[in-house]
Amino acid sequence: MINKLTIDSLKPLKIPVCFQRYSGKAEAYVTFHEYLETGEEYEDDEETLTAHYVQVDVWSKNDYTEIVKEAKNLLRAAGFKRLSEIDLYEEDTKVYHKGLKFYYIEER
């Protein structure tokens, strides 16, 4: 559920969006993974809300500022809440990398 929602939410970026790994040749792309899924709320011992914690990584050979801005807007519009973000640079591949952490609450 969360994988499809993440991919569908980021489609308007018009760059590849892939679960965990990307092996293509695009200069800019997005990967993501769910790093935690946990029950958030219970009623009568039944889970009623599930939290999905997702890291979205933007990778680019060039300035990714606009891609990151649009990705954050798209994810917020889909109901994701931003937790944190970090600027990284992959020295070995000379690729700019922005890590964005979000969570999404799913009603059961």
What are these regions (language model features)?
Residues 1-108:
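Long, contiguous binding/interaction regions
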